[in-house]
């Protein structure tokens, strides 16, 4: 979308503990060997349609704990991508990801007065609004709906990880529209 003239607005580049707030835009220096969330959501000025994509990287070397967190979120997104199809309940997908994260040792809870873990939605509709119906929660998915799929885990002291891609729901699955690779270390 950027190559076609899309205009990015309010891009998120948040590292370290700033990346533990899913909507924190980020400020200040980005430190080597810390998780950095890059969330870009360009809008096509001609059609008015939005794109949305998130990648999480480490500039330098990832620790074992960072790598495990990153791989677990990737596994959660892959689970969602396998399950999405017309007729499925979005909440079933959301709960399956929650269960996977908990099984891998990443609970969702309140620590020191702050939410940690998987405390935001699995995804949302995308089109003429950046966040529109349907949410990937308690709703039956329909053929040709356009959604983001963006599970994330957030733990201050370790960092945040989110992988986000845009898909079109089909009768038999989903078609991934995002084409940018996922790479942990850059």
Question: Model-flagged regions — what are they?
Answer:
Residues 1-186:
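Active-site neighborhoods and metal-handling regions in enzymes and metal-associated proteins
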């Amino acid at each position: 979308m950027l190559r076609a003239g899309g205009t990015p607005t309010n891009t998120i580049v948040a590292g370290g503990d700033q990346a533990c707030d899913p909507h924190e835009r980020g400020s200040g220096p980005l430190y080597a060997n810390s998780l950095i969330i890059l969330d870009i959501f360009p809008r096509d000025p001609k059609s008015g349609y939005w794109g949305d994509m998130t990648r999480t990287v480490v500039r330098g070397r990832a620790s074992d704990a960072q790598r495990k967190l990153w791989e677990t979120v990737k596994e959660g997104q892959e689970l969602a991508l396998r399950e999405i199809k017309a007729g499925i309940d979005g909440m079933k997908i959301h709960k399956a990801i929650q269960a996977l994260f908990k099984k891998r040792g990443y609970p969702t809870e309140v620590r020191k007065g702050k939410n940690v873990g998987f405390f935001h939605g699995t995804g949302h509709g995308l089109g003429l609004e950046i966040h529109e119906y349907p949410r990937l929660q308690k709703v039956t998915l329909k053929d040709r709906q356009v959604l983001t799929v963006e599970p994330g885990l957030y733990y201050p002291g370790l960092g945040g990880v989110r992988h986000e891609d845009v898909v079109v729901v089909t009768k038999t699955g989903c078609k991934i529209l995002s084409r940018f690779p996922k790479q942990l270390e850059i």
